[in-house]
Structure formats: structure tokens, C-alpha cells
Design a protein with these regions (language model features):
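Active-site-adjacent structural elements in enzyme catalytic cores
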Residues: 1-171
């Protein structure tokens, strides 16, 4: 099971949670946040939350739901779980979430059916942190609501090639 993402209400909170916010991550946040993009970056050394086996990273997203944003402005960042069990489709309504998760969840917030019904796109942007000559492309860890084509409009060649379009090694 993947570590839970951390929901935030502002890019300023992102800066407090991660070691560095590369320029391209700023551009992604400006275009796709609030929204269905989860970005994995190296966590601040001072981040002591037990988020599971993260290998020193944190997955961060700014939700598009106004109630969630208001809550986050009051509470600060929150580590959250998806409204589904690993391998199961995402719940679109609070009833579906309750049927799937039951009493394992203490509080359900109901803002009506999810408009997208799609999971967030998760990208690994850890390769953008550090010296420029050591940078690696951004990897898509999970395809979701934001397509690779949309990501490419911001990242260009900094987005990894899709698996089926990568050049084949010469025999």
C-alpha cells in the first residue's frame, strides 16, 4: 500500500513540507492546483510524521473541493487516505466510501458525488531536485484525471517518455 498523500491549502505549505520546490513544480502547481495532481518530492528533514515507507519523500496535493480547502486552512496539512481500498475503484459518493471502508473511517465529509470519478494523477518529481546536471525526468506513478499530454504542456521533455514510445536499444 502506498503512503498517504498530504493535502495542503497553499503552495506556501508545500514549501514547508519539502526540501525544494523546483521551478517546474511551481508551474505545475499554478496550472493544475487546486486539482487532481499529486506531486512526490523529497521531504524536509524536519518532517517527522509517520507516513509509512516513503524513502524520504512526501506526496502532496491541493484538493479542488472548497470545503476541504477551508478545513486545511484551519488545520494545516492533513495526511489522508483515498476513498477506496488498494486495487479497488475510487468511491464516487460518500455512500460508496462508507460501504467500502465502514467504521475504519472516523469522519466522512459529504459534498455530493465526485465530479471527476477519477483518481488523481501521481507524479514523482524528485528528479528535479538537486544540481541541474543530475536532474532526471518526472515519472508518472499513476495515470489519473490529468493526462500525460496535459503534463507535457508544462514539463515538455522533462516528462518521462510513455513506456510504449521509449526508444528501443539497438540489437
Amino acid at each position: 500500500q502506498a503512503p498517504p498523500p498530504v493535502l495542503i491549502a497553499s503552495v506556501n505549505t508545500l514549501r514547508a513540507l519539502v526540501q525544494e520546490v523546483p521551478e517546474m513544480v511551481e508551474a505545475l502547481a499554478e496550472k493544475f492546483w487546486p486539482g487532481a495532481l499529486t506531486i512526490v518530492l523529497p521531504a524536509q528533514q524536519s518532517l517527522v510524521w509517520d507516513l509509512g515507507e516513503t524513502h524520504g519523500t512526501v506526496a502532496v496535493r491541493m484538493p479542488a473541493n472548497r470545503y476541504a480547502l477551508e478545513l486545511l486552512q484551519e488545520t494545516g496539512p492533513l495526511a489522508v487516505s483515498s476513498a477506496n481500498l488498494t486495487g479497488q475503484p475510487a468511491a464516487v459518493t460518500v455512500e460508496q466510501a462508507h460501504d467500502m471502508l465502514g467504521e475504519r473511517v472516523a469522519v466522512y465529509l459529504d459534498d455530493g458525488p465526485s465530479v471527476m470519478g477519477l483518481a488523481s494523477t501521481i507524479i514523482d518529481a524528485t528528479g528535479l531536485v538537486g544540481p541541474e546536471d543530475e536532474r532526471r525526468p518526472v515519472r508518472v506513478l499513476r495515470d489519473g484525471a490529468i493526462s500525460r499530454a496535459e503534463l507535457r504542456t508544462v514539463l515538455g521533455d522533462l516528462l518521462e517518455r510513455e513506456p510504449d514510445t521509449a526508444p528501443k536499444p539497438a540489437p
